[in-house]
Amino acid sequence: MSDTELTTSDFTEAAEPFRLFAAWLDDATKSEINDANGVALATVDAEGMPDVRMVLLKGFDEGGFVFYTNFESAKGQEILGSMKAAMCFHWKSLRRQVRIRGPVEIVSDAEADAYYATRPRGSRIGAWASKQSRPLESRFALEKAVAEYTARYAIGEIPRPKHWSGFRIVPKTIEFWHDRPFRLHDRVVFSRNAKGDWDKARLYP
């Protein structure tokens, strides 16, 4: 099946999800105004209360979908508490959606270090200065922390904070949705079976 076919209604014939996702993300990168890799990340807290926020997908392969964060943040703590999460991409310009659910793994230190090294210097300083999700008394307090860490790491490399790393959602299900007239949408879900292979099914819209 050609990449063109993968991005039309024929996507329902795709045999596995990752090549299809790559084709759709490529389309979104060309079509969306910005942040085609922006994704809604859903977690639950210790009381089972759901939470959701936008993050940026920073990598994917057959092993899963990777994003990075402060592990001391609300989302970091919620994920560490359950080691499960869900994602939803919605590309409005393409009228497409992809939903991903599964257990979560922590990326290796080597993988986190490699990505951290690609971030702008200001973003690496920010990873140290921001006590993410905790109360902030004023903007000045944040800017002061940024200035302090900028001075501390004025020379040489900025090390990655131990509390800053990446998570990988290992998908159990990946669902593709494409808008059709009269809400008669196309939906296809891939589910990983006990052998690690993908079972595919169409769903009613």
From Swiss-Prot:
Swiss-Prot/TrEMBL catalytic activity: pyridoxamine 5'-phosphate + O2 + H2O = pyridoxal 5'-phosphate + H2O2 + NH4(+); pyridoxine 5'-phosphate + O2 = pyridoxal 5'-phosphate + H2O2
Keyword field: Flavoprotein, FMN, Oxidoreductase, Pyridoxine biosynthesis
Sites where the protein binds substrate: 58, 115, 119, 123, 183-185
Pathway entry: Cofactor metabolism; pyridoxal 5'-phosphate salvage; pyridoxal 5'-phosphate from pyridoxamine 5'-phosphate: step 1/1; Cofactor metabolism; pyridoxal 5'-phosphate salvage; pyridoxal 5'-phosphate from pyridoxine 5'-phosphate: step 1/1
Cofactor details (free text): Binds 1 FMN per subunit.
A Gene Ontology molecular function term of the record: FMN binding
Cofactors that this protein relies on: FMN
Domain of life assignment: Bacteria
Entry's Gene Ontology BP terms: pyridoxine biosynthetic process
InterPro entries per record: Pyridox_Oxase (IPR000659), Pyridox_Oxase_CS (IPR019740), Pyridox_Oxase_N (IPR011576), Pyridoxamine_oxidase_dimer_C (IPR019576), Split_barrel_FMN-bd (IPR012349)
UniProt-listed SUPFAM superfamilies: FMN-binding split barrel
Residues annotated for FMN binding in this entry: 53-58, 68-69, 75, 97, 132-133, 177, 187
Enzyme Commission (EC) number: 1.4.3.5
Function: Catalyzes the oxidation of either pyridoxine 5'-phosphate (PNP) or pyridoxamine 5'-phosphate (PMP) into pyridoxal 5'-phosphate (PLP).
Family according to the record: Belongs to the pyridoxamine 5'-phosphate oxidase family.
Self-association state and partner proteins as the record states: Homodimer.
UniProt-listed NCBIfam families: pdxH, PRK05679.1
Protein name per the record: Pyridoxine/pyridoxamine 5'-phosphate oxidase
Native source species: Mesorhizobium japonicum (strain LMG 29417 / CECT 9101 / MAFF 303099) (Mesorhizobium loti (strain MAFF 303099))
Origin organism lineage: Bacteria, Pseudomonadati, Pseudomonadota, Alphaproteobacteria, Hyphomicrobiales
Underlying gene: pdxH
